[in-house]
Each structure stands twice: as structure tokens, then as C-alpha cells.
């Protein structure tokens, strides 16, 4: 309803101002939406913004579409405010009690490919990796909610130097898998041990180089070894990602773009670019004219391709199969991402959209896999789950242990996912154990608790007649907050900022708790009881849809 009403307001403003783009903002306490368009028009009309606002409002009052929607328009100084009427609130509530509220009709295009996580398979995922995963998965869920055809991909680096080192380690070192040790943790032990051997004997580097040459040439035995070790690590990743409720539709292997000739084809095109430079067989791009100081290497002096060339082949393939490509990358990939975008454009290809994120950290410090000092995502999940179980046990000691553990698993996942996604991607953050599991503050469990409270009220209430004739200020405030959910989904996918949904879910939980404090529900009677229970049903459904879009369980009891 907000989406349709907002579109109608924009159309009406465009008709009476002649402007194609009209900025609309939240109206705060006194309006549902507002615009500062009078300031923009003042420059061309040479009139005071206050006078322009009055003239625009006069024109809008005659707009039939806004009148039919029950939208009231008024000028407050240079600002134009829009207040939605009872018809809007009623329509929004009727939609909000339906399953799947906030979902947009399915679209045929654009077909979107979203790549996230894509961590090197040489050790367990750490906290930095899972911010990538959680941002990417939350975006994917929002895109699907918005009706877009979407494929979520993990790009598997099975040709990098790290994998060659792991393969050498398995060939030459005795490091069997420990009992109950995850595959990715085993891979990390071998990788760390192999690096130590290389530090002691630099001559091993030549053996690693040889492995890289063999895998590039397609040597069957070497390719088999690389894939075997990478697959084992991915099996470990799968457990971690499942525990975080993160899903991928496809795992795309880097080596496939060498095997099928795509990398060679991209390199051939790059050789013909005016920015190409050659030093023997070494091939690079000089992108200085675009502001890059370092050359963008495509092929080593030994004739083997580098990751960048294979990544270009991958993104060319994306363009052949999809209309829009989105990559989620860490801030440490800003240079690489910018070089990739620049080169794709030089090749006549559409550049991917990149969502960069700063890293999340823990007080424990370094996360360097090479040094063997990092906090794995598995350790984080285990610790948060333990703390969640203690909290649930304190709050609900009467529940049996199995139930408490199930609730703790959901609460822990909510704590981690929400604490990570609630921060705008471009901002760094420190994971706060206490805040992540705080049932009373800005946390995933706090929103889950509001949902569980709504479920409890509805269960105690039993049958009731749905009623949409709201009367009190708190009822209308809550209904209008519920009505904003579809527009938040639209904004998340437009701006690629999933934290906006996290913020909305918390605000909705807050608004519901305020409503519940001031407006008796179960103790009220007649039509008042029915309309408040209708609101509770709408809140419960909207919180459920919000939580599920954030990848968080909407549990019914806590």
C-alpha cells in the first residue's frame, strides 16, 4: 500500500511541477511522507519556497487519484506534507494479515546473479567471511521477496596458490584428520603446516609452482587432487553456512573457465586492448589513465593465468546468462573490484555492481589463517549458542532440555545474523556478545521475543472477528508502521542495503511493545478487542515475514 501510494504522490507531484524525479522523505511525527521539492523549484521559478509550497499544495488538492486514496496534503512552511487516511490504513491492515505479506508479484526480468561468501577453501570460515555471507544471504532473500528471478552463487577458487600449497601438504606431510575434526579445520592444519615447511625450505616453492602449472594445463591427476581437497573444505563450509541459515543455489568452479577455454578467450581480447603491456609472456593492463597506479596482471611470466583473468571470464559468463550481476566483497577487495569493473567496461561488457563491506571483529584479535591465529565462525556459533542456552534456561527453566536447546539454536542464529546485518555495510563493527543476545535491546532475539509475544496473545485470545476500524493514536501509529514493510523491501533491493530491513524490524518491535503497554488487548471487549487483536495478527505476520527475510527463525515461544 505504501508503494502504491508513494507512486501516486510522485505522479501527482510530477504533473504539477514538471519534474521527473521528486525526492520524498519520511514525514516524521506530523506526516507520513514529505517533500522539499519547493527548494528545488525556487531556483528556477525565482520565488520563495514557502509560496511555491502553497501553490503546489493547491494544485495537489485537485488531484483525483490522491483524493481517492484519502491522502491529505498540506504545506508547513517550505515543506509539503502528506498524511494517509483511514482507507489507506484499512487496506494496509487487510494485506498485512495475509500469508506472504510484503511479497511482490513475480517478475520475468531482470535475471539477477548474486555472488557472496566465495572464501578461499584453505581453512574454516571466520567472522569476516560470515559478514559477507549474512549480507549476501539477506540481500538474496529480499530480492526474492521483491519478486526477482535470482541465482545465488559461490565462486570456488580451486586454482589459487593456497590450494596448491594445501595439495603439496597432503602429498608430503603426515597430518591425518582428527576424530570429530571438521574437514575445513583439517585443511587449515595442513595449510599452516605446509607454510611452515616452505619457510624452512624455500625450495619447496618450485614444487608448488609446478603444481600450479600442471593444474592450469589440465593434468588429470593434479586436477583431481586439487578438487578433492577443495571439496573437503567446502563440505566443512556447508556445515557452517547451514548453521547460519545461509544458502547458495550453485557453486561455480574457477577451473571450469580454464578448462572450457573462456579464460584463454578473455586473455586474447585483453591482448588486443591498447592498455595491454607485455614483458615476455607476462601480460598486464596499464590502467593509469583511469586512476590506477598498479598494473593489472593477467598472465604470469611462466604463461599461467592469474585469478584476475579467470574472474573476468567468470563475469563475462555471468553477463551471458543474467541481466544483472551483484558481488558482495570485503573492503580489502576495493582495488581489485574497481580494476575488474574498469576492465569489463574496456572489454565492452557490463560491469558488476559491488556491495563492499567493512569487517566485523572480535576482541580475540587476528584472523590470519596463514599464521594459524583466527577465530573461526564455528567457534563463534558454538560460544553464542552456549550463552543463548544459558539465557533461555534462566528465563524458561520449566522447559525440557531439548526444547531449550532448539530455542537456543534459533536465538543464537538470530543474535549473530542480526548483530552483523544491522550495521550499514560500509561501517566496521565489533561483535558484541551481550548486545547480540540482549532480549531487551536492539538485537535479533528482541525482535523474536516481540513476535513470540504476539503469538502468545493470539493463542490466548482464541477466535475473533477481524476489525479494521482503528480509533486510538497508538493503534494508527502501529498500523502505519506495519504498512511500511513492502516499501522497506523495495528500498533494500534498490539501494542494496539490507540493514534497512534490520532497522525496520526493530522499529516495528518497538512500536508494538509501546502499543501493548498503552492499549489493553486481551482485557478489552467487543469491537475494541477485535480491532486490537487484528492489529496483533498483522504485527505477528509482519514480524514473521521480516525475520524470515533476514534469515532468522520466527519462533513462537522463548
Swiss-Prot record:
CDD domains: ArgRS_core. GO terms for biological process: arginyl-tRNA aminoacylation. SMART domains: Arg_tRNA_synt_N, DALR_1. PROSITE patterns: AA_TRNA_LIGASE_I (PS00178). It is an enzyme of class 6 (ligase). A motif ('HIGH' region) lies at residues 119-129. Its main location: cytoplasm. GO terms for molecular function: arginine-tRNA ligase activity; ATP binding. The keyword ATP-binding applies. Its EC number is 6.1.1.19. It is found in: Cytoplasm. It catalyses: tRNA(Arg) + L-arginine + ATP = L-arginyl-tRNA(Arg) + AMP + diphosphate. InterPro entries: aa-tRNA-synth_I_CS, Arg-tRNA-ligase, Arg-tRNA-synth_N, Arg-tRNA-synth_N_sf, ArgRS_core, DALR_anticod-bd, Rossmann-like_a/b/a_fold, tRNAsynth_Ia_anticodon-bd. GO terms for cellular component: cytoplasm. Keywords: Aminoacyl-tRNA synthetase, ATP-binding, Cytoplasm, Ligase, Nucleotide-binding, Protein biosynthesis. The keyword Ligase applies. Belongs to the class-I aminoacyl-tRNA synthetase family. This is Arginine--tRNA ligase. It comes from Methanoregula boonei (strain DSM 21154 / JCM 14090 / 6A8). The lineage of its organism: Archaea, Methanobacteriati, Methanobacteriota, Stenosarchaea group, Methanomicrobia.
Amino acid at each position: 500500500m505504501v508503494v502504491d501510494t508513494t507512486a501516486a504522490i510522485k505522479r501527482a507531484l510530477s504533473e504539477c511541477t514538471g519534474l521527473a524525479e521528486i525526492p520524498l522523505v519520511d514525514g516524521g511525527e506530523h506526516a507520513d511522507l514529505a517533500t522539499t521539492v519547493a527548494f528545488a523549484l525556487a531556483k528556477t521559478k525565482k520565488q520563495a519556497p514557502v509560496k511555491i509550497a502553497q501553490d503546489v499544495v493547491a494544485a495537489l488538492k485537485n488531484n483525483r487519484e490522491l483524493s481517492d486514496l484519502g491522502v491529505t496534503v498540506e504545506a508547513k512552511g517550505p515543506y509539503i506534507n502528506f498524511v494517509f487516511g483511514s482507507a489507506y490504513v484499512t487496506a494496509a491492515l487487510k494485506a498485512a494479515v495475509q500469508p506472504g505479506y510484503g511479497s511482490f508479484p513475480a517478475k520475468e526480468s531482470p535475471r539477477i546473479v548474486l555472488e557472496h561468501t566465495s572464501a578461499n577453501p584453505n581453512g574454516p570460515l571466520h567472522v569476516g567471511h560470515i559478514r559477507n555471507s549474512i549480507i549476501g544471504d539477506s540481500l538474496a532473500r529480499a530480492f526474492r521477496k521483491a519478486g526477482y528471478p535470482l541465482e545465488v552463487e559461490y565462486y570456488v577458487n580451486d586454482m589459487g596458490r593456497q590450494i596448491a600449497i594445501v595439495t603439496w601438504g597432503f602429498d608430503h606431510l603426515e597430518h591425518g584428520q582428527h576424530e570429530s575434526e571438521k574437514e575445513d579445520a583439517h585443511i587449515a592444519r595442513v595449510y599452516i603446516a605446509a607454510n611452515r615447511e616452505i619457510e624452512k625450505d624455500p625450495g619447496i616453492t618450485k614444487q608448488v609452482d609446478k603444481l600450479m602449472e600442471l593444474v592450469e594445463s589440465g593434468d588429470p591427476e593434479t586436477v583431481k587432487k586439487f578438487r578433492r581437497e577443495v571439496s573437503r573444505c567446502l563440505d566443512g563450509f556447508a556445515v557452517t553456512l547451514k548453521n547460519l541459515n545461509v544458502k547458495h543455489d550453485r557453486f561455480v568452479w574457477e577451473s571450469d573457465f580454464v578448462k572450457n577455454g573462456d579464460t584463454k578467450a578473455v586473455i586474447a581480447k585483453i591482448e588486443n586492448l591498447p592498455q595491454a603491456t607485455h614483458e615476455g609472456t607476462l601480460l598486464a593492463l596499464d590502467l593509469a589513465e583511469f586512476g590506477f597506479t598498479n598494473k593489472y596482471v593477467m598472465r604470469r611470466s611462466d604463461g599461467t593465468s592469474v585469478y584476475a583473468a579467470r574472474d573476468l571470464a567468470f563475469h563475462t559468463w555471468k553477463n551471458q546468462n543474467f541481466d544483472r550481476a551483484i558481488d558482495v566483497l570485503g573492503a580489502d577487495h576495493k582495488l581489485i573490484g574497481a580494476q575488474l569493473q574498469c576492465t569489463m567496461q574496456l572489454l565492452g561488457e557490463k560491469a558488476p555492481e559491488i556491495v563492499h563491506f567493512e569487517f566485523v571483529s572480535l576482541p580475540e584479535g587476528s584472523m590470519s589463517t596463514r599464521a594459524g591465529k583466527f577465530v573461526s565462525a564455528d567457534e563463534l556459533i558454538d560460544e553464542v549458542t552456549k550463552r543463548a542456552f544459558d539465557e533461555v534456561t534462566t528465563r524458561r527453566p520449566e522447559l525440557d532440555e531439548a526444547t531449550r536447546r532448539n530455542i537456543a539454536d534459533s536465538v543464537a542464529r538470530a543474535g549473530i545474523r542480526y548483530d552483523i546485518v544491522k550495521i550499514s555495510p560500509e561501517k566496521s563493527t565489533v561483535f558484541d556478545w551481550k548486545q547480540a543476545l540482549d532480549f531487551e535491546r536492539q538485537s535479533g532475539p528482541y525482535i523474536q521475543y516481540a513476535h513470540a509475544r504476539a503469538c502468545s496473545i493470539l493463542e490466548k485470545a482464541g477466535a475473533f472477528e477481524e476489525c479494521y476500524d482503528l480509533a486510538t493514536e497508538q493503534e494508527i501509529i502501529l498500523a502505519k508502521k506495519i504498512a511500511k514493510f513492502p516499501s522497506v523491501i523495495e528500498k533494500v533491493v534498490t539501494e542494496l542495503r539490507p540493514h534497512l530491513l534490520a532497522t525496520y524490524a526493530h522499529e516495528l518491535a518497538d512500536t508494538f511493545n509501546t502499543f501493548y503497554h498503552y492499549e489493553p488487548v486481551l482485557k478489552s471487549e467487543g469491537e475494541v478487542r477485535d480491532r486490537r487483536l487484528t492489529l496483533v495478527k498483522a504485527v505477528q505476520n509482519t514480524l514473521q515475514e521480516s525475520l524470515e527475510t533476514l534469515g532468522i527463525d520466527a519462533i513462537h515461544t522463548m
